[in-house]
């Protein structure tokens, strides 16, 4: 019995490791390990400079940060998508919207409504054009799915 009380193995445990005030979100760790979520701004800018609007549009919607809680990442992705949407000609919008599936249209609608929350110069008029075309393709169901969704962009 005296042998167990003199043991010093308990001193090897770092109790600060188990501090409840040191909370780290598992989703943020997974996102950091997987790389930066959201669209790649350099890829999208390169496609915009080349004039390939449709590929830039799909690249901007790819890897959207829906599951992350980091607002800076979401704001950066919103800026990239808004840049692509404002660079489109109004005659090309319908073709771009029709190239999306149902989930893509819902994601586009999320970005449109997010853009309505924080309007910039001339963005509201462009977003209204996109909203009109997305509503024509996606129907009222896309609006309902966006407004009731828990995961935001």
UniProtKB/Swiss-Prot annotation:
Principal subcellular localisation of the protein: cytoplasm
The UniProt keyword set, sorted, is: Actin-binding, Cell projection, Cytoplasm, Cytoskeleton, Phosphoprotein
Output the Gene Ontology terms for molecular function. actin filament binding
Annotated compartments: Cytoplasm, Cytoskeleton; Cell projection
**Per its UniProt record, what Pfam families does this chain match?**
P16-Arc
Domain of life of the organism encoding this protein:
Eukaryota
In this UniProt entry, the residues modified to Phosphoserine are 64
Q: Which InterPro entries match?
A: ARPC5, ARPC5_sf
Which cellular component appears as one GO term in the record? glutamatergic synapse
Q: Which biological process annotations from GO are given for this protein?
A: Arp2/3 complex-mediated actin nucleation; cell migration; regulation of actin filament polymerization
Q: Which family does it belong to?
A: Belongs to the ARPC5 family.
Described by its record, this protein's role is as follows: May function as component of the Arp2/3 complex which is involved in regulation of actin polymerization and together with an activating nucleation-promoting factor (NPF) mediates the formation of branched actin networks.
| Oligomeric form and interacting partners | May be a component of the Arp2/3 complex in which it may replace ARPC5.
| Protein name per UniProt | Actin-related protein 2/3 complex subunit 5-like protein
Report the gene name.
ARPC5L
